[in-house]
């Protein structure tokens, strides 16, 4: 979740117009204070915001959230050689291997999204993604032969999940899984759940630009989240007030390679093995981060028309897209955007 609108949304959430201070609930005689904490996890900065009755409760909430994210990073990271994700690539070839519930949840969701998008979203693209990761360091587009060889070790059909047994099986040696297009959203929602389990009603977790948030802050109808900064009259407000949901944004503004007259995104199209070159930013709003994070990546690969068709066929998410062509900027929204956003507004308390 990772682009122009992503940075705008992240900044807006972290610098909410709600000042730190005491907030008295209508239904009680105790006060809530806003507390914030930042730690590095999953290769980025994670910020947690909570409203609690005191510092001790806030510290417990922060620790629960950050610890949950750290535990998930140890499972889902493709950068850590000893992560569970990387370990199964070597032992699950041809043999079903039982995995943790967290890893299974992410891989099952990824497999389902791959089916729904005919492979536009594909976590088996690890070998290809690693070539593009190296390309961003060397500032050179990957060699065609190297891309072709890497792609021969990919394909979502080669990834099998068994819900009853909680197992994963791979069809081919040399495969590498990369869940970067879905993991941060899952981690944000899981950290939020850990905080909520402590009795904290209003909290927000921001992992880079993957945002998950619970009940509205005191005295408001939602967390203020900026979704675009386009000038002029727009059908969509530039700031939304949302509660009990998640927001994820994908784009090429932060991670990209400028080469051969093109800007190649870190998001790779499995059908071409190339980084995306369209200037498209996708923001997805959903009830949970797992859904939002996966869909923004899938829609980026599918493009505007097919991406909107994908999300319009679902009931659990909506999307806002910004497409830039030269000096022209176009703002597009999925068909149920307004009604879905309205449903995520919480009553002021």
Residue ranges: model-predicted function:
Residues 2-349:
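Mature catalytic core of soluble alpha/beta enzymes
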């Amino acid at each position: 979740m990772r682009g122009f609108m992503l940075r705008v949304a992240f900044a807006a959430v972290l610098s909410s117009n709600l000042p730190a201070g005491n907030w008295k609930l209508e239904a009680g005689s105790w006060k809530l204070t806003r507390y914030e904490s930042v730690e590095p996890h999953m290769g980025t900065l994670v910020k947690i915001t909570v409203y609690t009755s005191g510092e001790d409760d806030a510290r417990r909430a922060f620790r629960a959230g950050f610890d949950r994210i750290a535990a998930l990073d140890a499972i889902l990271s493709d950068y850590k050689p000893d992560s569970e994700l990387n370990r199964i690539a070597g032992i699950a070839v041809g043999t079903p291997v039982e995995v943790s519930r967290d890893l299974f949840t992410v891989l099952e969701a990824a497999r389902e999204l791959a089916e729904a998008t005919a492979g536009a979203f594909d976590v088996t693209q690890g070998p290809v993604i690693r070539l593009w990761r190296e390309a961003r360091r060397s500032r050179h587009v990957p060699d065609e032969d190297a891309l072709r060889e890497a792609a021969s070790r990919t394909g979502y059909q080669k990834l099998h999940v068994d819900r009853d047994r909680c197992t994963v099986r791979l069809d081919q040696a040399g495969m590498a899984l990369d869940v970067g297009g879905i993991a941060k959203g899952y981690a944000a929602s899981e950290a939020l759940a850990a905080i909520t389990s402590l009795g904290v009603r209003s909290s927000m977790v921001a992992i880079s630009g993957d945002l998950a948030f619970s009940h509205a802050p005191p005295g408001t109808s939602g967390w203020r989240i900026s979704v675009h900064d386009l000038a002029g009259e727009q059908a969509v407000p530039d700031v939304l007030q949302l509660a009990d949901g998640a927001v994820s944004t994908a784009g090429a503004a932060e991670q990209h390679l400028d080469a051969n007259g093109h800007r190649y995104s870190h998001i790779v199209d499995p059908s071409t093995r190339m980084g995306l070159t369209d200037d498209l930013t996708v923001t997805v709003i959903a009830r949970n981060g797992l859904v939002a994070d996966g869909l923004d990546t899938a829609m980026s690969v599918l493009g505007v028309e097919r991406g909107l068709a994908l999300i319009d066929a679902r009931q659990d998410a909506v999307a806002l897209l910004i497409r830039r062509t030269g000096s022209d900027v176009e703002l597009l929204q999925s068909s149920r955007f307004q009604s879905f956003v309205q449903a995520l507004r919480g009553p002021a308390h």
